[in-house]
């Protein structure tokens, strides 16, 4: 095997594995931010930028074919931004942090995976069922009352029960767990992660109590803070800042 001076098969393998994992993690975070913003804008467009529809998404049933198309793509981009890429990030964080506290790292990972699974089901359901109900509602002679009831049930389940209750708890567990695991080497980021986790719990509490305005206000803060968290983490991973400098310590090795 040809080798450059000072290199070894082991170091080459580790370098390759690190670049792959590091690139995948940073790429997933960038997709979350970029595609997530697009998803949010599509949701706002589907809701026709109406504050009353934003507060009560069930009213979207009267949006017509244009809103149906926008809702379809908004939910799909939501699936491929906020949910599926999070799996990559969660596994990378677990790999980097599990040696510190295996049980805490596992709990944080399970919180992240629970968030991904529940939220993905909600996004997929909204993408496939919601637009069909909106189009059916717009048809002449449609049973609009029954369709509106079905659409209202769908939005209550997806928005209030899954995204703003179950997901809020799961992602809070992940954020707080990561904040505890990173409190020694990245104290500022760790505090920010724990604070973001608490904000998720506060929004969840307001949702359960029916305080819609307070819930939406907190979620607005969460939206901005989450972007900051993603970009901050991407810089830490890409810059190989502790604890991400030795993510490849368990990478498979080969003998020459």
Annotate each PLM feature.
Residues 2-255:
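Hydrophobic, aromatic-enriched alpha-helical segments typical of multi-pass transmembrane helices
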């Amino acid at each position: 095997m040809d080798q450059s001076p000072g290199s070894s098969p082991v170091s080459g393998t580790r370098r390759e594995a690190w670049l792959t994992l590091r690139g995948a993690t940073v790429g997933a975070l960038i997709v979350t931010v970029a595609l997530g913003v697009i998803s949010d804008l599509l949701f706002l467009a589907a809701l026709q930028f109406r504050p009353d529809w934003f507060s009560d998404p069930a009213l979207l049933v009267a949006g017509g074919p244009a809103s149906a198309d926008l809702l379809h793509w908004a939910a799909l981009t939501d699936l491929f931004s906020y949910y599926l890429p999070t799996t990559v990030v969660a596994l990378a964080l677990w790999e980097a942090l599990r040696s510190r506290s295996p049980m805490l790292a596992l709990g944080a990972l399970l919180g992240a995976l629970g968030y991904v699974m529940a939220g993905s089901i909600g996004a997929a359901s909204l993408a496939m069922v919601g637009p069909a109900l909106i189009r059916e509602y717009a048809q002449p002679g449609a049973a609009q009352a029954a369709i509106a009831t079905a659409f209202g049930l769908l939005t209550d389940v997806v928005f209030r029960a899954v995204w703003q209750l179950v997901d809020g708890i799961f992602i809070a567990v992940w954020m707080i767990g990561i904040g505890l695991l990173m409190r020694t080497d990245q104290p500022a980021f760790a505090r920010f992660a724990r604070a973001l986790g608490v904000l998720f719990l506060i929004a969840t509490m307001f949702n359960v109590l029916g305080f819609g305005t307070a819930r939406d206000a907190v979620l607005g803060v969460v939206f901005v803070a989450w972007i900051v968290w993603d970009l901050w983490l991407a810089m830490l991973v890409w810059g190989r800042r502790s604890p991400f400098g030795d993510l490849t310590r368990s990478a498979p090795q080969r003998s020459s």
